[in-house]
């Protein structure tokens, strides 16, 4: 049958062949346009459903049915309450981090006097020389190398600032006593085992602050 069709096609006049070809192309174009039309309609429908879903997801409790609104409102209130509570927690952390500010008035005065001497007097020069020699003599670490390679004035300032930080770490609370220092040392001991430079600085800070704690 296929051979008969082929024979008929060969015998067909050329103008009829052109007509049939044009008709075939027209049918293909119509079929393609219908497919595109169906796709565009489907896309519009999907967009509409997505838009409706988004609007439904952003519905406020006031537009929901009463039973659903009752379920959502406690969650909203809990979230607002946690947001109000958070600054208070942050404030507590800041109070702990502002080391030295919680010391008794007498200890606080002695602490600030000591820190001032470190930055402005011969005590500070003696401190940085002692720290430099101890760090130079210790086992080499990345931190010790970093400090030893600093320019002298920058190194002195860094060592003084690190000492001040340890002083404020050790001297805090209503009144710092020896047992308080022991507890704080135990807290930072694991850190000091890894940071030998900090251990050296902490020991010198404690040596300077011992008279304040024993006061």
From Swiss-Prot:
A Pfam family hit: Paramyxo_C
Single Gene Ontology BP annotation: symbiont-mediated suppression of host innate immune response
Species this chain originates from: Sendai virus (strain 6/94)
Keyword Plastid: no
Posttranslational modification: Protein Y2 is produced not only by alternative initiation, but also by proteolytic cleavage of C'. Only alternative initiation is detected in vitro, whereas in vivo cleavage seems to be predominant.
Keyword flag Cell division: no
Lineage: Viruses, Riboviria, Orthornavirae, Negarnaviricota, Haploviricotina
Protein's name according to its UniProt entry: Protein C'
Residue segments, region Disordered: 12-34
């Amino acid at each position: 049958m296929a051979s008969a069709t082929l024979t008929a096609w060969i015998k067909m006049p050329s103008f009829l062949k052109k007509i049939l070809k044009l008709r075939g192309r027209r049918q293909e174009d119509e079929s393609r346009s219908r497919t595109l039309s169906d796709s565009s309609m489907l896309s519009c429908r999907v967009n509409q459903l997505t838009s409706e879903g988004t609007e439904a997801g952003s519905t406020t409790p006031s537009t929901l049915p009463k039973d659903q609104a009752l379920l959502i409102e406690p969650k909203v209130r809990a979230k607002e309450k946690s947001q109000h509570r958070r600054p208070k927690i942050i404030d507590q952390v800041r109070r702990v981090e502002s080391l030295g500010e919680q010391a008794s008035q007498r200890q606080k005065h002695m602490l600030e006097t000591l820190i001032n001497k470190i930055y402005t007097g011969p005590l500070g020069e003696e401190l940085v020389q002692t720290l430099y020699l101890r760090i130079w003599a210790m086992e080499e670490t990345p931190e010790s190398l970093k400090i030893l390679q600093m320019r002298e004035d920058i190194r002195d300032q860094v060592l003084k600032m690190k000492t001040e930080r340890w002083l404020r770490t050790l001297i805090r609370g209503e009144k710092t006593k020896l047992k308080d220092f022991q507890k704080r040392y135990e807290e930072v001991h694991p850190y000091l085992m890894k940071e030998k430079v900090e251990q050296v600085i902490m020991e010198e800070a404690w040596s300077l602050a011992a008279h304040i704690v024993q006061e």
